[in-house]
Amino acid sequence: MKKQHNYTVMHWGTWQVESREGEIVAVKPVPWDKSPSRIGQSLPDAVTSQTRIRRPAVRAGYLQHGPASREGRGKEPFVEVSWEVALDLLARELRSVKARCGNEAIYGGSYGWASAGRFHHAQSQLHRFLKGFGGYTASTNTYSSAAGERILPHILGPLSPLHRQHTHFSELARECQLFVAIGGLPLRNAQVNGGGANDHMLQYWLDKMQANGTRFINISPVRNDLSAVPDAEWLAIRPGTDTALLLALSYVLIAESLYDQAFVASHTVGFAPYRAYLLGEHDGVAKTPAWAAAITGLDAQRIADLAREMARHRTMVNISWSIQRARQGEQAYWATVALTALLGQLGTPGGGLGFGYACTNLAGAVRKAFSGPRLPAGENAVDSVIPVARLSDMLLHPGETYEFDGQQRRYPDIRLVYWAGGNAFHHHQDLNRLCEAWRRPETVVVHEQYWTAQAKFSDIVLPATTSLEREDIGSGGHDGFMIAMSAQIPPVGEARDDYAIFCDLADRLGFGEAFSEGRDAGQWLRHLYEESRPRAQEEGIALPSFDDFWQQGVLEYSAPERPQIFLADFRADPERYPLSTPSGKIELFSATVAGFGYRECPGHPWWDEQEAARQRQEAARWPLHLLSSQPRARLHSQYDHGSVSRATKVQGREPLWMHPSDAQARDIREGSVVKVYNDRGAILAGVHLSEQILPGVVQMSTGAWYDPLDPKEERSLDKHGNPNVLTEDRGSSRLGQGCSAQSCWVEIAPWREELPPITAFDPPRFIEV
């Protein structure tokens, strides 16, 4: 198709691109974006950098000895080969694994954000391909919010649709008097949205709310988690103790008869056992503000006063995704649901509940929505599915059973891992354990654009194009925009689109026609767009023809006439508009969850003193609580090699924020490099000192590319600063089996040796055979 414009879409924004002679010269945010992300400025220098994968490559030992050489994974040089050699080798291994072990032995979960374009979305292409090949072991849920994703259907409803149904910011600006932000409202998180962020609106709406008199309270160990509201009250809570605070707030509402008795009676079930627990009738411990103060570090009187303020004002309570990425993270979400049910403001304009305002650019900003262009994936003939955060457990313990959300399941025996569009060496916890697990399969294949750690730890590496080198359609589906994405530069080196790679593989494996349906990439774009037009029409959106869309470049849908209010219909008539829970109501006590028999997840929200004691023991050994947050200069690990992310480094290392008192006790100074360590590993980091963080707590961003000092050495020092070297690879609970990265304790010491050079962004060594 003829290029008509210069738009491209990334998860963090829509950009106008200037290119010259095969290079990206400049990118400019589109004029309608209120607060553009700066991440896009990494594109010009990153796309054609030395980090780019330019030819297919095979690990030397694998090329010579096949799967028998798996111990060399991540340690050996690579051999660049032709596409014919690489695809023939991969097709042979796929056939072999299928014939010997069945399709269950292929893991294609391939978690990651990939690209914003809807057709060239790498996971969608991979899953369609593997389903056509007979199926694969898949993954379920996310690293971001798995604990919430599993508890909420039992007590309120599925998280994903709830996220899209949040009360619109315009209603909050009109009606909300008090906004309680548990975990803050970080602007850095709201830079992104799956499928593209076209208009960054968080700061705009928070300014509107402040101007209209909304008062904000930031409940977080980190003050700048609500930096968008400088006057917000900061309640510096100890990490991991939010559940205790929420229980105490509910206690005050009940003890002082401040809760909405009529709403509780008509819209909830299970009040009596929950009330009994809060009042201490079960365990002899009333969940009073004084009880919570000893756990959280907050003032008991302030806790009691906060409960009263919430009852007196139109209050929105928002809990961030970060809170549930912890041991028993399900409990904080359940306790938040219970608290807001007691307040009785669910479904009111400006009041109620949020599970992710500021977690992406979506919550509270949904405009006219429809299911946009999407590649049909087909049916998976294999029913093997694991919780995504149990990746290492699956690879290390094939055949073992585990418990998950009321079921007993079995880990499959994975022989081949196929990844496209993600980076397990960013997402996963305890990277030294992952290194061990990653060497268990016979073959690891990756489609990648850059020489990330995951690419360096693979056997067959296939170079893929970036969004700037292919045509696509950008559509988040809910933000009111659709963008025609033109190819801005030719493919770098020998890079191919994922679709072209899979077409060639499918031809070799005998299902090429079924996979491609006889269409090239341009024909697929036209087909998927035209197929989406009737769905848009059902939502009152009239899409032009594909040719007109491509000529125009940008489509913008109108905003809804009536702003969305979360659970308004349920509030008005719970019988006519029941929830999807077993009772159709909010479940303060869940017979379903109680029936699972999990000690750590009884039938109502609770504080697990046994787990708290275990964590105190860890803190006695490792006195600093490490929080790993989303980065502001990249999306997860995407474009860590770009100029924007690299400019944030301290002596080349990922920054670590700590309180001056903690630094002084360890003879650590601003801008110095330190060793951060625990019994799982050690990393280097560069220090920033700040009084905006609670003493005893340190914070790093995730996504620094893993860079072991000596890849041949087990548990080697990561010289770049990836906090997931230090985090524990343990499920949040048997119910959620989510990531528990925020439950992490470390010690820090000055680094007094010579600084090793950063090699994270260097290609591996290549040899000829």
Give the ranges of each region predicted by the language model.
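N-terminal leader/propeptide and maturation segments of large enzyme subunits in energy/redox metabolism
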Residues: 62-85, 251, 258-300, 380, ...
